[in-house]
Amino acid sequence: KDGKKIAEASGVQGTIKVPGVKAWTAETPYLYKAFITLKNKQGVSEVIPQKIGFRNVEIKNAQLLVNGKPVLIKGANRHEIDPDGGYVVSVERMIQDIKIMKQLNINAVRTCHYPDDPRWYDLCDEYGIYVTAEANLESHGMGYDEKSLAKFPEYLQTHVERNEGNVKTFINHPSIIVWSLGNECGYGINFEKTYDWVKAYDQTRPVQYERGGYDSKTDIHCPMYIDYEESEKYCKSDGVKPYIQCEYAHAMGNSEGGFKEYWDLIRKYPKYQGGYIWDFVDQGLRDKSPVTGKEIFTYGGDYGRYPASDYNFNCNGIIAPDRRLNPHAYEIQYWHQNVWIKDLDAVNGAFNIYNENFFKNIDDLHLTATIYANGVKLSTVEIPETKGIAPQTTKMVKSDALKYAIAEAESEHGKEEITVNFAFASDGTEPLVEKGQVMARQQFVINEYQFDKVDTPIAATSTKISGKKGKLQNNSSIEVEETNSYVKVSAKRMSVTIGKKTGMIDYLDVDGEPILKFRESMKPEFWRAPTDNDYGASLQKELKVWKNPVMNLKSFDKSEMKDSIVLTATFEMPEVKAELILRYCINAEGEVSVTEKMTTDKAAK
């Protein structure tokens, strides 16, 4: 410890008691160095240095505990891949990956679906990453039922040996807190006996396996891709196993839109302790386009039609092959963050800071608050009162500087949107975390943007407009022209034409300049471009009816309110078993408000 000998033992087996030990965690990765010396009659023949960490892992009260604390697993699955080296990954690239994990508040990794380069575990020990260490077992192609290799006794030795190699090779790494028996191999007697072997050899760690489900031999309930409803159902049950999804929040393409909902549940239920995102990095290889000569990342069919391609399905990472952050990485960083501002009292410049860490304070973070008006920066306030906030505690902070900055912003920009952006930036003392790196951030809206209000009545009495053209009875500044095919409403600089047969805005102009031309109806849009995850679930086929659903106009009504006219179109949508009401409200200022209400048949699919 600190270069000094603190304990010694001799013999083939020995026990050393280390006084005042500093425990290892991913937040505080304190390591000791042990020297194993082999001697013979001639003297010392070999000395092996071994870094070791002291920590305890156990399961109590349906929670996974590290040193007695129910840590949250903010994890990711990581394949060994490099855009230039393929499956050969350098130490420099490994360190870069851990640096990015720290940046994104990722504290755990699952070595999917095989043991990694031994140096990876050394780095996780050194820099602080929890590891679920998985054996190289996957027989996905055989399915999960009767043909699963997990059920055939002749494959028992293979199941045991692969886990034996994994456990015996890496057992001394403190970063490894869970053993994983394999991935997607089905379930059977071979996994039950493999579990028994691992538990007999190493009583210090939990063992998990996904395919067997809750009732199988697994210490952790670790399913994959379970939705919010089923996750909450388990959390409310009397299940006695921690709930940590081994794969979830599939990060392919434009994704992570529902990440918040998972973490709302994780922070609500004690037995729900997180999960491992699928996955960390896009598995593409760097190349040049044969057409443009520009740098591209290749995959699947880029290498010909044989072997069979799964297209871009191996590119489902939080980060790109060259380790640039994909857009959804910032969503993950936010919901993984370990510090939160709560209960902002803008009038008094007061708020609470919650430290979600389990083992360290946040003295290495520097807090600032920046005030914006309509997105324009007004001022930045330094808030030094963040020292001494212990793990899992909340501190109330009051800043006069923040109070006055907010008051000044409201005084000078009262009609604009005013926001306060809090940022916790690193002081650079934590390894691999650069000085100034923002580790946590939050935005609070102090004054919402003031939109001009348009009178949008929910109901109105019908009124008859005599003749083809006339003034609104309650307001002479609104002119209405009606024919058998349309109603045209003009007010100030604007005119809008709504078709009686279409129920849509068919024409719109301002100062005589067409904004929307005839036969270019402004129609409701029920479709968006499919994402990669949509394609993976074939949702673009299942939901294709929504791209251009049939809309049959049932009725078209008009009514008059004070200073406005309301036109209401009601549609029947037989393909999707729904009714749609479009309501157009045009006021004397020439403002058009469009609202829509859809009622669906809940019994229909």
Describe every region a protein language model picked out:
Residues K1-P118, L123, G128-V131, R162, ...:
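Secreted/periplasmic carbohydrate-active enzymes, especially glycoside hydrolases
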Residues I98-L104, A108-I318, P327:
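Substrate-binding/catalytic cleft of secreted carbohydrate-active enzymes
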